[in-house]
Amino acid sequence: MADYARLLEAANEARRNSYCPYSGFAVGAALLTTDGTVYTGVNVENASYGATNCAERTAVFKAVADGKRKGDFVAIAISGGPKDGSPVPCPPCGICRQVLSEFTDAATFTVLWVTEITDGDMAFEKHTLAELLPGAFEL
């Protein structure tokens, strides 16, 4: 299976580029595709909060813009926390879960989030998207 350490580190590294002047809560995501490509994303806040975009969706949209489609995604890692602090548990929001369900097999797609970093080692939670979004909306 995927190299979770590499994916978690990419999410944590991406978090540094978050644009979060209003909340101060930075989120980074790293989305792994079947060909081994990792697409990163960050949350991008806006003074009009409705225009804000989450890190997970930023990563998905970058991958889709690059031609990736349903079946091309293996896992996503998320790192969130204070802009200048250590990560705290940050599961994906409902909108991000729904967007992920559009492009993945929820039963096999892995969702990871960093829970803490101790002495350089990242602890994380691991779930399938189906566990996090039972009964996803589908057409």
Please describe what each predicted stretch is.
Residues 55-78:
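Short, solvent-exposed cationic patches
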Residues 24-32:
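Short beta-strand scaffold segments in enzyme catalytic cores
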Residues 43-57:
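Compact, glycine-rich, soluble single-domain proteins
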Residues 11, 29-30, 59, 63:
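Small-residue (primarily alanine) positions within well-ordered alpha-helices
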Residues 2-17, 71-139:
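C-terminal binding/interaction regions
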Residues 33-35, 117:
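Short acidic-glycine loop/turn motifs at beta-strand connectors
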Residues 19-22:
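Short Gly/Pro-enriched turn/cap motifs at secondary-structure boundaries
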